[in-house]
Amino acid sequence: MLSLEITTETLFSDGSKYQTFRVKGGVTFSTGVYAIKNCSGDRTLKNGNLIDLKSICKYKISDNEYLWSKVLGNDRYAAKGTGKFQLIDATGVYKNLVGNTCTYALNIFDEIIFAKGVCEVEETVYKKINKN
């Protein structure tokens, strides 16, 4: 479960708006570890539709390691609430995941964001990560 905070907003004459934001919440990985996710970024919306999105997220993982991801709006399908993110940095065994592009799905209910991410990784990498 993730919370969204709009930090700035600019309205344009065509009805579109530019926002900066922060997202915080918890996530679970398929290996059973948990993480606290902190993101910041910006987005452009028009008529309630997402036009562009950029975001960087930092995950503090329950095994005392870290992972960073990047979301860019040109690989997302806003109407479905799905998109792609790339793992851009990590510590420890998670360095094996850097460079992977993953898929996410999200939905917002009462200002809370529910999200799920899926990353396909080689079995050898999964086994290394799952040992933690």
Residue map of PLM features:
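Beta-strand-enriched cores of mature, soluble protein domains
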Residues: 1-132
